[in-house]
Amino acid sequence: VLDLTRHEPRQALAAQAQVRCTDLRLEDWAQPVQSAFESGEGGIEQYLARHRAALSAGRALSHFTLYVEERPVSALTLSLLPGLARLDDIGTVQDCQGQGYATALIQAVLAFARARGARTCVLEASLDGLSIYRKAGFKPLFDYRTFCQE
């Protein structure tokens, strides 16, 4: 969880990077998501269809993509409700990971959400993403584990 009323952005965008809302260009948004989560072609097509349907239904979703020299390298989904923001689908193209692109994208989208009245932001994180989210200022609410019986 992140208190946006006290949040100060920690990282500016690199000069060659741009953040854009890509609701009308979901294919660009999908490239980093697919690369980061290693979903096959069919999986991302189903995911795109669900996101297109949600946008068509007027759901409070926005899709953001960070471009470097016009290449989509990092992406996320923002859900906004009165006073509350949620980040999902945070991913960076594998060959661009570790360069601060996701952190820069998160900071830009947090500023966007705050400007639209969000006071709190939440997200779910895997162990792999914890350092990025902590760097962005998020604090854990709780830990949980998933078990599988084979």
At which residue positions do the language-model features occur?
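Ligand-binding pocket scaffold of soluble enzyme catalytic domains
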Residues: L76, I106, P140
